[in-house]
Regions:
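AMP-binding/adenylate-forming catalytic core of the ANL superfamily
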Residues: 187-203
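Active-site-proximal beta-strand elements of phosphoester/diester hydrolases
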Residues: 181-187
């Protein structure tokens, strides 16, 4: 971070891991925007329980310098994260719940991407992505909410999102000739993992 500051970088996106928050390794970093995607059963060897894991993550939203909090409103732990926010923190949410800022009204997946109708504070807008997997839609919506919260226009954000492309090292489509299902593949260190499109989790 120090080297980036010396190079003139003024804004950085980083993962505030539960370990870093718990061990105070981010105390010297000025974090203005906090984003919560979800919690899965990871790092329990360190935290001991999901409750302790969630409590560590929630520390991100108790920081006094925070001005914007963006959460996945469909995750039941979102309220826990927001409970520690001070009154000057603006809160935005994404998901399918009626109360969220960017709400998914309809969603369709295709062989090389997906499309969703999104209810926004400025009306309904179509979001087209060249990214596969529902998790990518969820992540893009969170990123759009962050930029919207920072003052960027929604129309420009939706247009920019449509130009995103899959990373070469990421997920790619593999259509089996004898099966109608669309599978996802990912190469990691010469190993091929196949995941069902419904969950997009390597097995």
């Amino acid at each position: 971070m120090g080297e980036l500051a010396q190079q003139g970088v003024r804004c950085v996106a980083l993962e505030a891991s539960s370990h870093a928050l718990d061990q105070h390794r981010l105390d010297a970093v000025n974090i203005n925007v906090g984003v919560f995607t979800n919690l899965t059963r990871d790092h329990l060897d360190y935290h001991g329980s999901m409750a302790a894991y969630a409590a560590s993550k929630a520390k991100l939203f108790r920081r006094t310098e925070l001005t914007l909090a963006v959460v996945n409103g469909d995750d039941p732990l979102a309220r826990l994260m927001l409970a520690g926010c001070t009154s000057n923190v603006r809160v935005l949410a994404t998901g399918q719940d009626e109360a969220v800022t960017l709400r998914v009204l309809d969603w369709q997946a295709f062989e090389q991407g997906q499309q969703a109708m999104i209810a926004t504070p400025e009306g309904e807008k179509m979001l087209s992505l060249n990214l596969m997997g529902r998790f990518n839609l969820d992540n893009v919506l969170l990123a759009l909410a962050v930029l919207y919260g920072l003052g960027k226009p929604l129309d420009a954000l939706f247009a920019a999102a449509s130009s995103l492309r899959q990373c070469r090292a990421g997920w790619s489509a593999m259509v089996m000739p004898t099966r109608p299902a669309l599978l996802w593949t990912m190469r990691i260190r010469r190993m091929l993992f196949i995941a069902h499109s419904k969950r997009c989790a390597p097995t």
